[in-house]
Amino acid sequence: GGLKATFVADYMHTIIIFVTILTFVTAVYVNTDITGGIEGMYDKLVQAAEIRPIEGNAAGAFLTMASAGGLMFGIINIVGNFGTVFVDQAYWQRAIAAKPSSTVKGFLLGGLCWFAIPFTLATTMGLTAVALDVDITMQQAQMGLVVPAAATALMGELGAILVLTMLFMAVTSAGSAELIAVSSIVTYDLYRTYKNPNASGKQLVKVSRATIVAFGLGMGGLAVVLLSM
C-alpha cells in the first residue's frame, strides 16, 4: 500500500496505455484498409489542407511544425505546467522517495515517456480525424472527443473500448498519486503538526484513510459539476 502501491500502479497502467497507443499507430500507419497507410494519410491530409486550410499554419497545412496556434499552445502548456511540477505534492513525494542518484534520470525518463503519449496521439488519432473527415462538432472537439471519435471511425466499437481503457488507466494512475499526496499533507503536515503531535500510528492511518475517502468523493463530485456546466 501507500506510495509503493502508486509506483506499481503507475508502471502497470503506463504499460497498458503504451500498448493501446501502439495499437492505434499500427491501425493508422500499418493496416492500410481504411487510412491507406503512411502514403494514404499523407495524400488525405494534403487534400484536406487544400479544402480547409488551417489559419496560422504554414501554407495552411496540417503536416507542418510552423504553426502559430501550436506555438501559443506550447508556451501556455509549458508555463502552466511549471505549477503542476513544482507545487504538486505527488512529484515531491517521488523525488524524496527515490535515490538521489536516480532522481534526475527518473524524471527525465518520465518526461520522455509522458511526451510520447500526447505526441503519438496527435500524430495518429488527431490526424486520422482530419484524414477520414470524422463528423464531429467544434463543441465536441473542445470537450476532447476527437480521439474517441477517430478511434471509433477507425476500429469501430473496439476503438472506443481501447480509448476508454486508456482513459481509465490514466485517470486511476493520476488519481491514486493525488490521493496519497493529499492524505500525506493532511495527516503529517496538518493533523500531526497542529492537531495531535503525539498521534499514534493507528490514529495517523485512520486520518489518512478518512482523507483519501473524503478527497476521492470530492474529486468525483467536482468532476460531475464540471461536466454539467
Predicted regions and their residues:
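Membrane-embedded helix-loop-helix hairpins and adjacent transmembrane boundary segments
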Residues: 1-229
